[in-house]
Amino acid sequence: MKIKLANIYVDDLDKALHFYTQVAGFVKKTDVSQGGYRWLTVASPEEPDGTELHLERNDNPAAKAYQQALFEQGQPAAMFYTDDVKRDYERMKDAAEFKMPPTKVTGSTIAQANDTCGNLIQITQLDRVRT
């Protein structure tokens, strides 16, 4: 068994697609519309056939409340791993509002950014490779 898809709720699909592709650097994997519904996913350019991030409209009141609560509490809705958080911060900082610049914490260095769609995302560089 493996993880193939994870959801992140967003308030605007086009804005989310722009952020996750043009700012974060992912690639659009799937973009299909049918009857007012749009299935939109992005993936890592390093693993385009790997795990996909489903950008899902927060039309459901429970989803919207959950998203807002996480944001207000400063909790990231998604965490992405990198081998160089400072490099990714420098690449993204002019186009993204970082709530936390690269910061050393126990076992890793992290940075947190506003995805412009109602979420905080966290970029994480582990101190060592876990096996």
Model feature map: region roles:
Residues M1-L5, V27-F80, Y89-T116, T124-T131:
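Vicinal oxygen chelate
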Residues V10-L13:
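Conserved beta-strand-loop-alpha-helix junction that forms the acyl-donor binding cleft
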Residues A16-T21, M92, G118:
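Conserved active-site tyrosine of GNAT-family acetyltransferases
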